Amino acid sequence: MAIDRIIASPAVRVTETLDLFQPAAGIDAIEPDWDRRIYLASSATLIDVIRDIGKDAQNLLIAGHNPGLEDLILELVPESPDDELRAKVEEKLPTSALARLELDIADWRDLDTKSARFVAFIRPRDLDASLSPAMDDD
């Protein structure tokens, strides 16, 4: 999967995250489209932002904020008792997590709820166990 477009909130935390993520992911040549609508956006607003892309991108990266992103994922991926990745998002979409979804659409204007499937979900603690929440042994 080659990301060909990035749409991001212009919030400082997002810009700092992308400054680190883009070179590490080999996508530092892509200039993000900074979209103020993403800041504090509901899932409905995020769907509108995505639909506005039309056919201008095949593989899209959205960098934004919760609860909107978590709600968006849960709206796009249908519930399934066997979907462990969706269950992890239902538990929590932590800061700096990455969710990869696939959709069978050629035009982002065709985006609809319950139309995506999980391919990957990576939390910071999946990459570095020291980032896991503290657990009590008592």
Language-model segment annotations:
Residues M1-Q58:
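Phosphate-coordination/substrate-recognition cap region in phosphate-metabolizing enzymes
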Residues Q22-A25, L76-S80:
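Active-site catalytic pocket residues across diverse enzymes, especially alpha/beta-hydrolases
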Residues I3-A25, L103-D138:
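Conserved histidine-centered catalytic loops in small-molecule metabolism enzymes
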Residues A57-E79:
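A glycine-rich beta-strand to alpha-helix segment
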Residues A11-T15, N66-P67, T95:
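Alpha-helix N-cap/helix-start capping motif
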Residues D33, L61, R100:
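Conserved beta-strand segments that form the floor/walls of ligand-binding pockets within enzyme
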Residues V77-V119:
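Domain-level recognition of soluble alpha/beta enzyme cores
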